[in-house]
């Protein structure tokens, strides 16, 4: 049984290839420019208080270096993977203290959004390698970015290809329809059928108007007929916050902790 405690910090990480729209997605998710353009290869954390359905929620957004084309990005992958592990290790260390810090704040990563460019018809070898590294260490939700460039047929096909690969390579992704992880019955509305989520981010100057402008017209990022951002935003900022937090604590962390205590080697 999941025990819910309100106002715990919720941490979302974005990872994926360069130019896949990670920073723009975060800004569109929040509705204003929070994450700036990256000019380095480090991991950036943005901490904020956000009104989520009338509750002020403490949220951390983590923007990571993008994987590149034409060069070995294994070091970047290891950096991100080690960051996720480090947060789990810090929690183990705090939990093992005789006198715990009453003000200690959980920094574990509760959700990893993995961005797949719409120009890819499927997961590339680098995507598969990374996802296999972090599978079981964090709740993974795959996302197809800049999906407004795809036809309806292409959207269906790329989703099918990605899901087949996820199953083939035994990559563990978060079960959005598990009744233990959402806060209201209405939230469990076959969200797994939307995975990977098709998202479109607003133009930099249009975060508040929630649109992407083209010569032929506008794409509303809040229109479910245009993309899956409305459903993804609702689960991230409302219905699945505590489910993602609790699953991290009760399943991911406990499995990791058991492996560490038994001397197991993590991937």
Curated annotation (Swiss-Prot):
Keyword Glycosyltransferase attached: no
Region of interest (G1 motif), ranges: 16-23
Family matches, as InterPro entries: G_SEPTIN_dom, P-loop_NTPase, Septin
PROSITE patterns reported for this sequence: G_SEPTIN
Segments forming domain Septin-type G: 6-263
Binding residue positions for GTP: 16-23, 66, 146-154, 212
An MF annotation (GO) of this entry: GTP binding
Keywords: Cell cycle, Cell division, GTP-binding, Nucleotide-binding
Region feature (G4 motif): 145-148
Protein name according to UniProt: Cell division control protein 11
Origin species: Encephalitozoon cuniculi (strain GB-M1)
């Amino acid at each position: 049984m999941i025990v819910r405690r309100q106002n715990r910090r919720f941490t979302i990480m974005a990872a994926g290839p360069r130019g896949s729209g990670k920073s723009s997605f975060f800004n569109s998710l929040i509705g204003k420019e929070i994450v700036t353009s990256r000019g380095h290869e480090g991991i950036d954390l943005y901490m904020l208080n956000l009104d989520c359905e009338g509750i002020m929620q403490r949220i951390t957004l983590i923007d990571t270096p993008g994987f590149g084309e034409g060069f070995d990005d294994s070091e970047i992958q290891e950096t991100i993977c080690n960051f996720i592990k480090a947060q789990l290790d810090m929690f183990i260390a705090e939990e093992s203290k005789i006198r715990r810090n009453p003000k200690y704040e959980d920094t574990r990563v509760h959700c990893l959004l993995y961005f797949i460019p719409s120009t890819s018809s499927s997961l590339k070898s680098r995507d598969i390698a990374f996802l296999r590294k972090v599978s079981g260490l964090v709740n993974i939700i795959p996302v197809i970015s800049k999906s407004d460039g795809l036809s309806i047929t292409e959207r269906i096909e790329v989703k099918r290809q990605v899901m087949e690969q996820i199953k083939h390579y035994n990559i563990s992704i978060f079960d959005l329809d598990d009744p233990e992880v959402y806060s209201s019955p209405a939230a469990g509305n076959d969200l797994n059928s939307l995975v990977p989520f098709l998202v479109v981010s607003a133009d930099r100057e249009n975060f508040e108007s929630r649109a992407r402008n083209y010569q032929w017209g506008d794409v509303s990022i809040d229109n479910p007929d245009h993309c899956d951002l409305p459903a993804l935003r609702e689960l991230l900022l409302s219905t699945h916050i505590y489910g993602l937090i609790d699953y991290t604590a009760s399943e991911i962390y406990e499995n990791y902790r058991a492996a560490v205590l038994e001397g197991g080697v993590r991937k």
